[in-house]
């Protein structure tokens, strides 16, 4: 795995000032790797919160590279949904993005991404 992809919950927690989320993002960036998010994470983050906070959220998101949802990611997400029918499309896209790009997915969503699943990092649980 080379680099880190962040799930929506980690980014939203960091925006809310939750210290463990902020520390996890700092840790990833300080390792010299670039932090990445899927376009799906970008959508989920910007769909939450009050309009007055959108500027701050957009500025925070601009620190990350954004992986667009291309055909390869879409095909991988569809395959993941066939394998795991209960996996929702946004989560399948987020996981497919990390897997396709060869990155570790940093999340606290242990319902959809178990901590013992290869390629998953769960830094904390609420």
Regions found by a protein language model. Give the residues of each.
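Nucleotide phosphate-binding site architecture
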Residues: 11-12, 43-46, 114, 123
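Donor nucleotide-sugar recognition loop
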Residues: 84-90
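Acidic catalytic patch
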Residues: 63-84
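Acidic, PIN/NYN-like endoribonuclease modules and their adjacent C-terminal/linker elements
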Residues: 1-3, 95-126
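Short active-site oxyanion
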Residues: 31-34, 63-65, 99-104
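Short, well-structured N-terminal submotif of metal-dependent ribonuclease cores
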Residues: 1-37, 46-58
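Conserved glycosyltransferase catalytic-site signature
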Residues: 8, 39, 71, 90-92
């Amino acid at each position: 795995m080379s680099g880190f992809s962040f799930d929506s919950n980690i980014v939203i927690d960091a925006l809310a000032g939750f210290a463990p989320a902020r520390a996890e993002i700092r840790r990833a960036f300080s390792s010299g790797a670039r932090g990445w998010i899927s376009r799906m994470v970008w959508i989920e983050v910007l769909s939450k919160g009050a309009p007055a906070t959108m500027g701050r959220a957009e500025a925070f998101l601009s620190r990350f590279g954004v992986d667009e949802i291309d055909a390869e990611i879409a095909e991988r997400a569809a395959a993941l949904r066939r394998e795991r029918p209960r996996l929702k499309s946004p989560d399948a896209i987020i996981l497919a993005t990390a897997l396709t790009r060869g990155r570790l997915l940093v999340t606290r969503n242990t319902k959809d991404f178990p901590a013992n699943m290869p390629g998953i990092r769960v830094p904390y649980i609420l």
